[in-house]
Amino acid sequence: MDKIKIITDSTCDLSKEIIEKYDIDVMPMLINFGEESYLDGVEIKVDSMMERIEREDTLPTTAQIVPTRFIEKYKGYLEEGYKVISIHISSNMSGTYQSACLAKTELESDDIVVIDSRNVTVGLGLIILKAARLIESGITLEDLEKEILEYRNHIKSTIAFESLDNLVRGGRLSKGKALFVSALGIKLMLNVLDGEMNVQGKIRGTKKMVKAMIEQFDSIPKKEGEPIILVELENEDIYLPIKEYLENNNIEYLKLPLGCSVAIHSGPKVCALFYVEEY
């Protein structure tokens, strides 16, 4: 049986309890407020970060994990007799995956597998959880890679994106247009498709958004035994009805908070469902 260590990055948004249970090594991204840098989830938490963004009306940036950090991490585990599976945020959203690939190339080791999750937040988290369960079953690194490359293709998501504040702060949207959209009560429904954020629809009103999310969730057959994850940041108007729906229908789910790295780009008032389609 291979002795395998899972390495990921802090965009996976898994809870401390899950990380400790499966002994997952989560490498923090850097959150930069000007010249000040903080390790995501270690030196700064999402609540304090959002408060600072609001107070200072400034948007921090994120920095990818550099190859030297991966080299150091991989070498340490290889020396301890581990094989490594390193699974990261979509390469379309960050250069972290490329950094991990450069580190593997530098070390010239067949005992390191690097995977582009093509996902983010708990979509990446679902893949990490799958890898952890497979490792517990005694899988080899070679077979684990095959399983995860297939599994990642079946992660589905339904995301309510209400606030345009961070798009304005980041210069991606004019304040005037944001005010116009907000005044109309328009909310965006998105998903992660082929490693990128994809706008599925523009929906007017909270009740219609909840209805659309539930309808889409119901329309996709789920793979039995795989987790359903509900993730939320400052959006109880959508989170609570979704939670009530799941509980009334005896649908088991995990509730996890959105982390710093993702919240910088999404802004507040986000709620999403991530799950695995039948395959």
UniProtKB/Swiss-Prot annotation:
PANTHER family: DEGV DOMAIN-CONTAINING PROTEIN DR_1986-RELATED, FATTY ACID-BINDING PROTEIN TM_1468. Hexadecanoate binds at residues 62, 94. Residues 4-277 form the DegV domain. This is DegV domain-containing protein CPE1310. Gene3D superfamilies: 3.30.1180.10, 3.40.50.10170. May bind long-chain fatty acids, such as palmitate, and may play a role in lipid transport or fatty acid metabolism. InterPro entries: DegV, DegV_C, DegV_domain_contain. It comes from the Bacteria. SUPFAM superfamilies: DAK1/DegV-like. One of its GO terms (molecular function) is lipid binding. Disulfide bonds: none annotated. It comes from Clostridium perfringens (strain 13 / Type A). Keywords: Lipid-binding.
